Curated annotation (Swiss-Prot):
It holds the Pfam family Catalase. Belongs to the catalase family. Its main location: other. It is found in: Peroxisome. GO terms for molecular function: catalase activity; heme binding; metal ion binding. It comes from Nicotiana plumbaginifolia (Leadwort-leaved tobacco). This is Catalase isozyme 2. GO terms for cellular component: peroxisome; plasma membrane.
Amino acid sequence: MDPSKFRPSSAYDSPFLTTNAGGPVYNNVSSLTVGPRGPVLLEDYHLIEKLATFDRERIPERVVHARGASAKGFFEVTHDISHLTCADFLRAPGVQTPVIVRFSTVVHERGSPESLRDIRGFAVKFYTREGNFDLVGNNVPVFFNRDAKSFPDTIRALKPNPKSHIQEYWRILDFFSFLPESLHTFAWFFDDVCLPINYRHMEGYGVHAYQLINKAGKAHYVKFHWKPTCGVKCMTEEEAIRVGGTNHSHATKDLYDSIAVGNYPEWKLSIHIMDPEDVERFDFDPLDVTKIWPEDILPLMPVGRLVLNRNIDNFFAENEQLAFNPGHIVPGLYYSEDKLLQTRIFAYADTQRHRIGPNYMQLPVNAPKCAHHNNHRDGAMNFMHRDEEVDYLPSRFDPCRHAEQYPIPSRVLNGRREMCVIEKENNFKQAGERYRSWEPDRQDRYVSKWVEHLSDPRVTYEIRSIWISYLSQADKSCGQKVASRLTLKPTM
């Protein structure tokens, strides 16, 4: 169906102002009163409708990624990977797919300065011929916790104190002291990359491992990596304070203005590929979202390019109501066993139904651009006009049938029902390797962030000692530097 045929009239359809019901409005300034100074009458229908509509203009903000900006464009395949996947939108070089991309900060609220230290969201919706594929990632390749049972607590710890509504690092460091696997993400969070100069100059990662499946049914694990063609640029703390004090929407403005003048942002997409049979070769679990895949062993393969060449037409309709879901995949792609990814498949759809409504997938920005059909019907704010008599399947009166089968990974799984920690935690090695890859001045900025936040008077000696231990296990000299500036001895 074409949603535009059934949408309410807009101001452009009539030469004069009307109510929602189409009735003419001849005075949009003065309320209906008893005399010039009398009480306002409830029978002023236009006034009541106008106020009631205004009261309901806003929807609940996202629990995470509330502050964001969107843009449209296309993804173009530049390198043949048809031997790895049967996904139609990746079928051959030159194939283009329309996309919408949303950049965001993770923790901070809608309207907060875009210059604050935070992980940035990098979410891409591909409108393919086989349905939507949502690659919902960030500008860092890892996350704080590997199991979704800790996710609500993770976000609560990062968000403001519920009593004062102030973000406080004593809460953050207290909670994550129980999650040693979080140190690797802090090696990104306290690094320069979490102060990107804008959205155009930051990398993007799919974060989770997915699977690519070819026509023969052979599956490979895959990780996605976006690299900006204009390079990665970050701010110092001082620059971030200055930029945020000048314009709290600097990154949104930069993105919008760049596209408006034809300076289109572009990213190259590359992938890591891993044969499932090689998973046990590593000293870490490759499906652990707190780990990266080493490029020297699993080099990046080029796939395509992402170009953003159109600004959105309506911020509310195409940014606030834009909804992503890691569960949206297409034939030739599949999920991995990553515990956090598995639970995001449920959580994202659930939060969109709460935030936007049960029929959020009918909104033009979320609906697939290919032909689609199912028997999901009615519900609050349904605006799809349907006149068929058969709303079930199968039926001899309706030609709708099952789609042709496509390959999905098939493995024999066995094990006991249990709640357990993965075998290869290896919580500190990659954090240390990242620290040692930096120049001394970058290392010093990282150490300074730890010293700053561990110096909070509400951070106890026990919490400081735990973090010094974690840092020392990642890199002995890093732990010593932080400890010496805190007048604490590192413990192993």
